[in-house]
Design a protein with these regions (language model features):
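Positively charged n-region of N-terminal signal peptides that target proteins for export
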Residues: 1-4, 11
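A glycine-anchored, Pro-Gly-centered beta-turn/N-cap motif
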Residues: 65, 132-136
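A short beta-strand element within beta-rich, extracytoplasmic domains
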Residues: 89-99, 140
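Extracellular and analogous surface-interaction loops
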Residues: 73, 80-91, 128-133
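C-terminal motif of bacterial Sec signal peptides marking the signal peptidase cleavage site
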Residues: 15-19
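Short, surface-exposed beta-strand/strand-loop-strand elements in extracellular ectodomains
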Residues: 100-117
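Edge beta-strands of jelly-roll/beta-sandwich modules across compartments, strongly enriched
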Residues: 142-160
Length: 162
């Protein structure tokens, strides 16, 4: 609770210090500024690079990029992509899970809803995500997993992110 109050105070301070600049700002600039603040707070849920089971390479932002892992009996969770945002986003997510033993499950949290992707018989999966504003995360849960995972996340034909 104390951290939340400190963060709220910092947010109010930032808004107070920048409010004089908002008179000349366009609505898109204001949305971008507020989205950056939401993204900052949402980034605390993302697994740090040095703590990942696999390897992540970001593209445009924290929602897009490539993730790969080669595992030998790993257990844990990698929160790979996502964050907080006030903007809606449309992502294409595709990849492959090659399982030797154990399990690796791709989970997507979109605010309060959590879905698990079911790969086909060859381990491939792909889906389009219509992400609404809020907290949205793409993660993989490993349970004694031996095998490999490859995952790609990119924006679809969204002019805002081209």
């Amino acid at each position: 609770m104390k951290k939340l109050l400190i963060l709220l105070a910092l947010l109010l301070l930032a808004l107070g210090l920048t409010a004089c600049d908002w008179a000349d700002s366009t609505p898109d600039e204001m949305h971008g500024f507020l989205d950056d603040i939401a993204g900052y707070f949402g980034s605390s849920q993302i697994t740090d690079d040095d703590e990942l089971i696999g390897t992540r390479k970001l593209s445009d932002d924290a929602y897009t990029g490539t993730y790969t892992s080669d595992c030998a009996g790993n257990t844990g969770r990698d929160v790979i992509f996502g964050g907080g945002s006030i903007l809606n986003k449309t992502l294409s997510l595709e990849g492959q899970i090659m399982t030797e033993s154990g399990s690796a499950v791709v989970r997507i949290r979109m605010n309060d809803e959590v879905i698990e992707l079911e790969p086909d018989s060859d381990g491939h999966f792909d889906t389009e995500l219509n992400i609404l504003s809020g907290g949205n995360y793409i993660m993989i849960d490993y349970s004694d997993f031996a095998g490999s995972v490859e995952l790609h996340s990119k924006y679809t034909d969204d002019p805002e992110h081209e």
